[in-house]
Every structure is written in C-alpha cells, then in structure tokens.
Regions:
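Conserved N-terminal alpha-helix of the aminotransferase class I/II PLP-enzyme fold
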Residues: 36-90, 113-119
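Short conserved active-site loop signatures built around small residues
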Residues: 2-32
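Histidine- and aromatic-rich ligand-binding microenvironments
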Residues: 28-43, 132-134
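Conserved PLP-enzyme active-site core in the AAT-like
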Residues: 2-5, 19, 80-207
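Residue-level signal for pocket-adjacent positions within structured domains
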Residues: 8-9, 28, 50-53, 203
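Short, hydrophobic/aliphatic alpha-helical segments
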Residues: 7-13, 68-72, 198-199
Length: 207
C-alpha cells in the first residue's frame, strides 16, 4: 500500500492506523483481548522494558493502532486512549495541574466536567474559575500568576458558542499557560486544533 494518500477525509479515515505490521495480514487490525505477551527471547523482553508493549494494561496492538489513527487524523505528536471522554478530561487535568494551581474553564463546559472541577479538583486544592466562552482576547485580564490551563470546548457543549481560539491561544501562551480543548463536537475532520494553537485536544470518541 502506498503512503502517498490525499488529504480527502474519506481517504484519511481509510488509511489511518494501518501501518502496524503486527496484524499479520487481515485488512482490519484484529481485536486483541490478551493481557500477557510472549517474547521470542529475554533480549526482546529487555528491549521492550519501559515501553507500553509489555502488558495489556498499558494497551494492546488494537488500542495502539486506534491511537495511531487518531494521531494521523489530528496531526498530533502522540495519543492516549482512555475508557471515556470524561476520563480523558480528568487524566489530562490531573496531569497538568497541582494543588495551588488555577484553571480557567469555559462556562459552556460539559456538566460532568464542571462536576469534576467543583468536586475532585477543588478537594485537591486546584481552583477553577469559569469564563464567558465569547471572551476572546479578554481572557488575558483573567490570567493569574498561578493559571496553568485554559480549557475550551469546540464548540460549547450544550450552547454551541464558538471560542476565538487564536486569541485565547495567544493570551494563554504569552502567560505560559496551556490551551486544552474538548474537541468532541468538532472532531479532527472539522478543525485543525493544533494549527489554531491548541496544546492538548481531547475527544469523547463514542460521540
């Protein structure tokens, strides 16, 4: 199969994630349910140590193939599958924030995201402040010394506001903060998140 694919969405969807030679022939990557793996030699096992290809809890060839496809569609450097969209949001925020940090969250956010911020994050000493999703460059006035993340949704979860992403990105990056997007509605086919200045793009892929 040639790697010279066009940028047409249907072509990208068809070809993405198919470079993994571990499928041994099937057109579609097979579903791997195994948690334990065999290695041809102890040298191979040692070489794999530290990678995710040592135990099913870290992922299987099936999940890694899907991650690869999502990376290709989104133009991302790397990708991690989680059990749900909310787990992707919580994993990201817990990785980027620590006690004493400030999070600027779009007031149009998904309700379970708000519950996460007002519940678990608050108990961990992480402050969340909600901003008008139409604020644009005015977000600069809300940034504090401890603001680490500005979170947007593309588009607003229930009310569908469209954020001025380049303006938000410019303000956040000038401050040293990251811009994180819930891209569930937009999808990689609907916008180029990273070209617009997004640092981390999340999806509830089941949508």
């Amino acid at each position: 199969m040639t790697d010279d694919c066009s940028d047409h969405p249907a072509t990208r969807l068809t070809h993405s994630g198919r470079a993994d030679k571990s499928s041994y022939g099937p057109v579609n990557p097979p579903v791997v349910r195994a948690s334990t793996l065999l290695f041809a030699s102890t040298a191979d096992l040692k070489a794999a140590t530290g990678s995710r290809r040592t135990y099913g809890r870290h992922g299987t060839s099936t999940s890694m193939t899907l991650e690869q496809a999502l990376c290709e569609l989104e133009g991302a450097a790397d990708c991690l599958l989680t059990p749900s969209g909310l787990s992707a949001i919580s994993t990201t925020l817990l990785a980027l924030l620590q006690p004493g940090d400030d999070l600027l969250m779009s007031d149009a956010c998904y309700e379970p995201t708000r519950a996460l911020c007002d519940g678990l994050l608050a108990r961990l000493g992480i402050q969340t402040r909600y901003y008008d999703p139409l604020i644009g460059a005015g977000i600069a006035d809300l940034l504090q010394p401890n603001t680490r993340v500005v979170f947007i949704e593309a588009a607003g979860s229930l009310t569908f506001e469209i954020h001025d992403v380049p303006a938000l990105a410019a303000a956040a990056h000038a401050h040293g903060a990251l811009l994180v997007a819930d891209s569930t509605w937009a999808t990689p086919l609907g916008w180029d998140a990273f070209a617009l200045g997004i640092d981390v793009s999340l999806h509830a892929a089941t949508k």
